[in-house]
């Protein structure tokens, strides 16, 4: 009889020691996985938590409640999350989520899990199936005073939640209206890790969804229209393409004026083309790969597909904010188009929706946009995208080391002419009245491939919108230029340089 009580005293001492430091040490959690067969893991047991020395470790539980029937989803270890700090019991407070989630600190604290609605409804406690009595069970029934302290902690946490919505985990709640097709992300805990970018409508977080990294774009409530527009574009039939950003889910977090709107997409560690070009000089083949996949993505976005892979009609879509910051790069430098908050669909027999003229990023605005002289037809909007593509292609060439000459530090289009923060009036003067474009360096024209690519760039940013190339034509040209240059030997490079037209490029005639 002495040994169990000695062990009990030792465990109580360790709990008190953790409490004295302001945290309960978590080293082991109850483990359970409802999808153990599919994921090829154990169904249940104990899980030993591992993490960085300066990070706190927690346990978590997630479950569903279908008409009073409790269906356990997962239990296990949860890494450092301020929402779990000093919580000795696993308590979920959401009103009616798809999946309940709770986390706590302390060994095996997720054995029991509780739902305590914020609205003050009745507390509902869910217990696992009866098992053989354990030391932890004896401890749970012995330390009743801890329950009172836990209720005080829960009250403080409830007040904190009402002050600011937490970022520790996510359960998906769709805004009223038809939800976009997406997997049940709410079945899997999602944890925000770090801010990767800040933009016009909010910030982008790197987050962890089980074993995968994802990107979470968070919009404030006042930018609901942009969030809703981008969600609708992602939900358009046929938007699954290797050169378009992969959509995972959309979510509304929080309540009333403190609500936030989330878009969850694939995460690409190399970031945007802008960021990559700032820190890297690229080779000829890398330039061609980025340019070809980027133009392929825009070509597909612009395309009208009557019946796309059985999903239905994919309408033509104009991006309207095409720039290097909105082109992401996969690990192999394959380009992926992102940020469809200003995009507009062109469906037969329907108005295109919000088509205000001067939208997008000033630096990348076509002359007709800067002038406010837009023809509000589909082709006009697609040609505006093509002007911006010409500028992005110029950015690629400016950081390519293929030519025999210096590679300058990365600069945005027109940064050399009018600086980093040009006004609308300055751009109108330079782009519209003086018809200037970013400078094409002389030594670029001495490389056969870059020389041909510069011709394509000039035909993309042509002042006459109707003379601009289509994205599909750019894709064909880049592919042809790459093959022609890579197929030549050093002995015949000179002859190619003397006449750019040695390679028959696809016709300039626009197919938009």
UniProtKB/Swiss-Prot annotation:
Where is this chain's protein located in or outside the cell?
A: Cell membrane
Q: Does the keyword Endoplasmic reticulum apply?
A: no
Glycosylated position list = 42, 65
Q: Which residues form the Protein kinase domain?
A: 190-480
Q: Please list the disulfide bridges.
A: 29-59, 49-77, 84-103, 90-102, 104-109
What ranges does the Cytoplasmic topological domain annotation cover? 159-512
Superkingdom, natural source: Eukaryota
- Which enzyme class? transferase
- Extracellular side residue ranges read 19-137
Cofactors named for this entry: Mg(2+); Mn(2+)
Membrane topology note: Single-pass type I membrane protein
Write down the EC number: 2.7.11.30
Per the UniProt record, which residue ranges are transmembrane? 138-158
The positions making up the signal sequence are 1-18
- Consult the record and explain the modifications the protein receives after translation: Phosphorylated. Constitutive phosphorylation is in part catalyzed by its own kinase activity.
PROSITE patterns referenced in this protein's UniProt entry, alphabetically: PROTEIN_KINASE_DOM (PS50011), PROTEIN_KINASE_ST (PS00108)
Q: Which residues form the active site?
A: 321
- Protein's UniProt keywords contain Membrane: yes
How does this protein assemble?
Forms an activin receptor complex with activin type II receptors such as ACVR1B. Interacts with VPS39. Interacts with DYNLT1.
What job does this protein perform?
A: Transmembrane serine/threonine kinase activin type-2 receptor forming an activin receptor complex with activin type-1 serine/threonine kinase receptors (ACVR1, ACVR1B or ACVR1c). Transduces the activin signal from the cell surface to the cytoplasm and is thus regulating many physiological and pathological processes including neuronal differentiation and neuronal survival, hair follicle development and cycling, FSH production by the pituitary gland, wound healing, extracellular matrix production, immunosuppression and carcinogenesis.
Family note: Belongs to the protein kinase superfamily. TKL Ser/Thr protein kinase family. TGFB receptor subfamily.
Return the protein name: Activin receptor type-2B
Q: Which organism is it from?
A: Bos taurus
Per UniProt, what is the name of the gene that codes for the protein in this document?
ACVR2B
């Amino acid at each position: 009889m002495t040994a169990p009580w000695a062990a009990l005293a030792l465990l109580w001492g360790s709990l008190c020691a953790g409490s004295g430091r302001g945290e309960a040490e978590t080293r082991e959690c109850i483990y359970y996985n409802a999808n153990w067969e599919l994921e090829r893991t154990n169904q249940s047991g104990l899980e030993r938590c591992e993490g960085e020395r300066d990070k706190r470790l927690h346990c978590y539980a997630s479950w569903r409640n279908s008409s009073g029937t409790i269906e356990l989803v997962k239990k296990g270890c949860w890494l450092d999350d301020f929402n779990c700090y000093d919580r000795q019991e696993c308590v979920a407070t959401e009103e009616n989520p798809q999946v309940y989630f709770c986390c706590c600190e302390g060994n095996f604290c997720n054995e029991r899990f509780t739902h305590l609605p914020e609205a003050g409804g009745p507390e509902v406690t869910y217990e696992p199936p009866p098992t053989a009595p354990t030391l932890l069970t004896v401890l749970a029934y012995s330390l009743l005073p801890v329950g009172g302290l836990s209720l005080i902690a829960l009250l403080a946490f409830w007040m904190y939640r009402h002050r600011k919505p937490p970022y520790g985990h996510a359960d998906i709640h769709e805004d009223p209206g038809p939800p976009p097709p997406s997997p049940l992300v709410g079945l899997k805990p999602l944890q925000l890790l770090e801010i990767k970018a800040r933009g016009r409508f909010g910030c982008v977080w790197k987050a962890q969804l089980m074993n995968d990294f994802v990107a979470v774009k968070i919009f404030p409530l006042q930018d609901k229209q942009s969030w809703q527009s981008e969600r609708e574009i992602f939900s358009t039939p046929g938007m699954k393409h290797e050169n378009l950003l992969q959509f995972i889910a959309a979510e509304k977090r929080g309540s009333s004026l403190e609500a936030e709107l989330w878009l969850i997409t694939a995460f690409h560690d190399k970031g945007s083309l802008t960021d990559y070009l700032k820190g890297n000089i690229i080779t000829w083949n890398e330039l061609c790969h980025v340019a070809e996949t980027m133009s392929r993505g825009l070509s597909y976005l612009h395309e009208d597909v009557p019946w796309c892979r059985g999903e239905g009609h994919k309408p033509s879509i104009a991006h309207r904010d095409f720039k290097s910051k909105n082109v992401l790069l996969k690990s192999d430098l394959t380009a992926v188009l992102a940020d469809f908050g200003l995009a507009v669909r062109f469906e037969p027999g329907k108005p295109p929706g919000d088509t205000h003229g001067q939208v997008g990023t000033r630096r990348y605005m076509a002359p007709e946009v800067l002038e406010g002289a837009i023809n509000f037809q589909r082709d006009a909007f697609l040609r505006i995208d093509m002007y911006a593509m010409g500028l992005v292609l110029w950015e690629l060439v400016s950081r390519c080391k293929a030519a025999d000459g210096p590679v300058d530090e990365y600069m945005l289009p027109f940064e050399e002419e009018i600086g980093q923060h040009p006004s609308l009036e300055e751009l109108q003067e330079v782009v519209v009245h003086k018809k200037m474009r970013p400078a094409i360096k002389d030594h670029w024209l001495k490389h056969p491939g870059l020389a041909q690519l510069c011709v394509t760039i000039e035909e993309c940013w042509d002042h006459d919108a109707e003379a601009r190339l289509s994205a599909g034509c750019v894709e064909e040209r880049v592919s042809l230029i790459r093959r022609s240059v890579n197929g030549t030997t050093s002995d015949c490079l000179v002859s190619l340089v003397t006449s750019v037209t040695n390679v028959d490029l696809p016709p300039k005639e626009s197919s938009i």
